[in-house]
């Protein structure tokens, strides 16, 4: 009986070990990423610098485990997740990625987890780090000095669904709305975020220095300090949070958040 248990355990461990493949070069990462069949986990074992866009995964289900290694995008675009795909991004340190929408990840499919350290990523449109029109279960990590020309300096939820956003958001900025996070509706599709909880420090935008919402947001909790809404030709809204939709619950510590407009600021420094 013991022998049989050990054999079964050995098979189980072998199968789980075989489910991951390790890569240590950009070429290796892209080759594994594009395969239509293969292991479900790609483990990155060394720091990397990109010479081109990462692009879309070839197979329907994939997890990227960064192993805490740094991936420098060198101003190239990150991952693209298509409809019907399952994708997770774990233990990553990603910087200097840039795209039209979602510098690091543009998600139209389903993502279980996004976590890691994300810094100095950008979008010419919205979503300096993450642009979502699909489903994401959990976003957690450190987001610092990311930028979007339009909205969502770190995270832009465009009619999609996100269960949880957490972490530390420092000095992210957007040219329009949501210095760190923007949750918006599109046509008849309501953007929905169940909860946002984190530390928001020194983020900035014209409306919602830290968070902008015109869709549905369940709860917002955390620490908000030194966030700023500033508009050169219009009225700034909500130094910390600007809400033009539905937020069910807001609680936290608010200090030093400001709203400064070309004329009257709307909603004051903390919440509009």
Language-model features: locations:
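N-terminal signal peptide c-region/cleavage motif recognized by signal peptidases
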Residues: 14-15
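Acidic Gly/Asp/Thr-rich repetitive segments characteristic of extracellular carbohydrate-active
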Residues: 19-41
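Extracellular beta-strand repeat scaffolds in secreted/surface proteins
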Residues: 40-44, 165
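Generic short beta-strand segments
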Residues: 45-49, 253
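Extracellular beta-strand-rich solenoid/capping regions of secreted or surface-exposed proteins
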Residues: 49-63, 71-90, 95-110, 125-127, ...
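All-beta strand scaffolds that present successive hydrophobic residues in beta-strands
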Residues: 62-66, 86-91, 111-118, 136-143, ...
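Glycine-centered low-complexity coil/loop motifs and glycine-rich tracts
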Residues: 70-78, 92-104, 117-129, 141-154, ...
């Amino acid at each position: 009986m013991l022998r049989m248990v050990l054999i079964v355990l050995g098979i189980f461990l072998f199968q789980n070990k075989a489910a991951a493949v390790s890569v240590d070069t950009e070429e290796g990462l892209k080759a594994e990423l594009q395969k239509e069949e293969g292991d479900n986990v790609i483990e990155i074992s060394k720091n990397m610098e990109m010479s081109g866009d990462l692009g879309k995964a070839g197979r329907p289900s994939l997890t990227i485990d960064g192993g805490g290694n740094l991936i420098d995008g060198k101003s190239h675009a990150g991952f693209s997740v298509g409809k019907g795909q399952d994708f997770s991004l774990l233990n990553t340190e990603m910087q200097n990625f840039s795209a039209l929408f979602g510098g690091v990840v543009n998600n139209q499919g389903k993502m279980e987890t996004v976590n890691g350290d994300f810094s100095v990523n950008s979008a010419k449109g919205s979503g300096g780090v993450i642009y979502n029109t699909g489903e994401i279960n959990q976003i957690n990590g450190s987001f610092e000095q990311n930028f979007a020309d339009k909205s969502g300096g770190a995270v832009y939820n465009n009619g999609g669904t996100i269960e949880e956003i957490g972490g530390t958001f420092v000095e992210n900025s957007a040219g329009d709305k949501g210095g760190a996070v923007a949750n918006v509706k599109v046509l008849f599709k309501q953007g929905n975020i169940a909860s946002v909880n984190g530390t928001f420090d020194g983020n900035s935008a014209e409306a919602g220095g830290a968070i902008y919402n015109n869709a549905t947001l369940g709860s917002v909790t955390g620490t908000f300090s030194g966030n700023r809404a500033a508009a050169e030709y219009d009225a700034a809204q909500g130094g910390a949070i600007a809400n033009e939709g539905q937020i069910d619950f807001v609680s936290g510590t608010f200090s030093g958040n400001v709203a400064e407009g070309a004329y009257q600021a709307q909603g004051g420094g903390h919440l509009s």
